């Protein structure tokens, strides 16, 4: 385990990195003491709640990974959640109102609305439940047992199978795999409930996103597009509903930076109404466990409002500057090269990254060793995507640094620590 130098350690004093973005008032609305924070006793009293719990905080140079907490919410989002906590409210009424606000912000077509769910995976669960049950109370209480129900199959391209189709299958349906347009059409039968499209796998399948929904419309079948990680660009929020997809989902806690336990389900009003019937606060439903609270709903709407109004070009410039700083630092080490990479036409996780490579004849380290040493840094662990690719050719070790979830100032820490690690592996000349 390695610790940062004096400069890096000073920067990472608990709470220091984000002190400039702290809300001026206390979390619960009462007068705050010292620096705009509510004075706590017991847990949280040091300002370093993770340290008190014995958990190592992370500098996230990887991306919006759920395993690391997704993203960090803006102070405005936290304030909206605080306001949502000030009163009791009918959750059903709040969801309906939230859906109307989502429709406005996301420029939905006439007849569409939205629903705040407990994440994108929960949106898959309750969205497909809505397709299967409608508003039939018996069916709602019965699924995932589909005995006696008219629909039990969902068509999906074989190349679009992915870990999150578990949430589709959780409803009891059978996934019917197809590869070609002809196979898709041949697979449609009276038991077909819907057609599923995995948006980030668009290039992997023979049937593309626009053609897929047209086929569904021609056969009067609902089409569901899972676009969970597919913002930015902001326009993705309305692109697929205007294509005609009946249901579309996005993660709330990735680039939109809403609560991590929140997601967005958009779709035709009747389907959204039935999705709400299949989830909390309703009891005896498949979605009861996927509870979303009033605070998450309010925070999610505020985050969405801010995301739609955000200046993505300015944000990209900030990312570029952070990665340039790291690249300039490590690029001075003999044998090391750093290259800025950005694919604006990518479908999912569209964000810049810095590829750092080195000549193994000059630096005797593998990419996995560098990644592991970064992760072992203290007091903050520096996490990259993956653990170093063991399949990389040994003559070209490379790691990737992402600025997406990096906080201001953390580029200095990464530059210092990564330079230290690479220099430690330098071979004597």
Regions found by a protein language model. Name each.
Residues 1-17:
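N-terminal export leaders
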Residues 304-328:
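Structural signature of PLP-dependent enzymes
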Residues 88, 202, 230, 407-408:
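Short strand->helix junction
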Residues 83-85, 199, 358, 403:
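Short glycine-centered, acidic/aromatic-flanked micro-motifs in structured strand/loop junctions
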Residues 49, 331-420:
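Conserved C-terminal alpha-helix-loop-beta "cap" of PLP-dependent enzymes
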Residues 56-92, 98:
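Glycine-rich phosphate-binding segment of PLP-dependent enzymes
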Residues 384, 426-429:
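Conserved short beta-strand edge segments in small beta-sheet-based binding/regulatory domains
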Residues 3-7, 21-59, 64-68, 99-104, ...:
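Conserved PLP-enzyme active-site core in the AAT-like
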């Amino acid at each position: 385990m390695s610790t940062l130098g004096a400069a890096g350690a000073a920067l990472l004093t608990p709470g220091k990195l984000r002190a400039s973005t702290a809300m001026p008032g206390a979390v619960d609305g009462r007068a705050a003491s010292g620096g705009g924070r509510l004075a706590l006793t017991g847990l949280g009293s040091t300002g370093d709640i993770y340290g008190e719990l014995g958990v190592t905080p992370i500098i996230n140079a990887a991306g919006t990974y759920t395993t690391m907490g997704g993203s960090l919410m803006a102070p405005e989002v936290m304030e909206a959640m605080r306001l949502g906590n000030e009163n009791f409210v009918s959750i059903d009424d709040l969801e309906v109102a939230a859906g109307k606000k989502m429709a406005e912000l996301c420029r939905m077509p006439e007849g569409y609305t939205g629903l705040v769910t407990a994440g994108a995976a929960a949106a898959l669960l309750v969205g497909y439940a809505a397709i299967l049950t409608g508003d039939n109370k018996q069916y709602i209480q019965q699924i995932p047992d589909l005995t006696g129900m008219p629909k039990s199959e969902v068509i999906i391209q074989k190349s679009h199978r992915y870990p999150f189709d578990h949430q589709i299958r959780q409803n009891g349906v059978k996934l019917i795999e197809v590869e070609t347009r002809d196979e898709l059409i041949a697979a449609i039968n009276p038991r077909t409930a819907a057609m599923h499209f995995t948006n980030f796998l668009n290039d992997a399948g023979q049937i593309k996103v626009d053609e897929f929904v047209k086929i569904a419309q021609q056969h009067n079948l609902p089409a569901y597009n899972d676009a969970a990680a597919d913002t930015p660009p902001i326009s993705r929020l309305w692109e697929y509903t205007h294509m005609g997809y009946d249901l579309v989902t996005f993660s709330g806690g990735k680039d939109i930076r809403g609560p991590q336990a929140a997601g967005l389900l958009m779709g035709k009003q009747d389907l959204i109404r039935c999705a709400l019937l299949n989830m909390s606060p309703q009891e005896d439903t498949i979605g009861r466990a996927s509870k979303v609270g009033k605070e998450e709903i309010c925070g999610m709407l505020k985050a969405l409002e801010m995301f739609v109004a955000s200046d993505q070009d300015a944000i990209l410039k900030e990312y570029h500057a952070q990665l340039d700083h790291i690249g300039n630092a490590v690029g001075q080490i003999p044998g090391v090269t750093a290259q800025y990479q950005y694919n604006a036409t990518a479908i999912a996780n569209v964000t810049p990254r810095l590829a750092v490579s080195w000549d193994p004849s000059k630096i005797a380290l593998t990419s996995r060793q560098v990644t592991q040493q970064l992760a072992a840094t203290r007091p903050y662990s520096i996490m990259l995507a993956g653990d170093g690719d063991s399949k990389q050719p040994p003559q070209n070790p490379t790691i990737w640094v992402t600025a997406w979830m990096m906080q201001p100032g953390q580029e200095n820490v990464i530059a210092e620590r990564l330079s230290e690690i690479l220099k430690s592996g330098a071979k004597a000349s």
